[in-house]
């Protein structure tokens, strides 16, 4: 057998082994919270983002707002959404203020993602209001000086919620998933994050960096 053919066989095996090692190295050993608010029309994209986050980090804890936990819409049933989140994460959903509070004192998360984050939740975060499971999770998490990543989805992002976004942008430990207008003609004030960038934004935040559009 020619020398070149002999060398080809171990080279292919070596490449396969290296690929497996790379996949293990790429999995980041961090615990990430993934909180979903009631922007129901974007929940399908949020689930895609959750899949990508779970593929990037070793542990993911699902969290939903009370509105999300209790509301069935034309976009789907609340129960089905929560079961899907539990399937992806292999972890029970946190859906109450009481269940979210230990995130702080027990330092349960390395990073928290809110995806999607509604205008209502943006306003509460900007003004220190803690009356939902998601805002409690955020407050409890931030007390540990750990990163919070926000993926806005709101029809008034360039109207009433612009004030909230502006207040949160310069705050320490808060990062945003890159966002922009989703329908300038029919909804000129609406802003939605690029959900395909959620995992990248999370990884950047762990390094103290804001992912740029």
Task: State what each model feature region is.
Residues 2-148, 153-213:
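A cross-family phosphate/adenosyl-ligand binding-site feature
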């Amino acid at each position: 057998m020619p020398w070149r053919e002999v060398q080809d066989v171990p080279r292919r095996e070596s490449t396969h082994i290296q690929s497996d090692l790379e996949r293990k190295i790429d999995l980041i050993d961090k615990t990430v919270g993934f909180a979903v608010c009631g922007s129901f029309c974007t929940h399908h994209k949020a689930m895609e983002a959750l899949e990508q986050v779970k593929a990037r980090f070793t542990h993911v804890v699902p969290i939903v707002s009370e509105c999300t936990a209790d509301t069935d819409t034309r976009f789907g049933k609340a129960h089905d959404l929560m079961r899907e989140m539990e399937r992806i994460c292999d972890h029970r959903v946190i859906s109450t203020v009481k269940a979210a509070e230990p995130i702080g004192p027990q330092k349960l998360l390395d990073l928290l993602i809110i995806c999607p984050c509604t205008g209502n939740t943006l306003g509460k975060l900007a003004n220190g209001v803690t009356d939902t499971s998601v805002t409690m999770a955020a407050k409890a998490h931030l007390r540990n000086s750990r990163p919070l990543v926000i993926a806005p989805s709101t029809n008034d992002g360039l109207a009433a919620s612009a004030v909230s976004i502006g207040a949160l942008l310069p705050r320490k430990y808060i990062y945003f998933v890159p966002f922009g207008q989703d329908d300038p003609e029919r909804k000129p004030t609406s802003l939605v994050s690029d959900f395909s960038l959620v995992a990248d934004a999370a990884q950047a935040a762990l390094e103290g960096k804001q992912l740029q559009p």
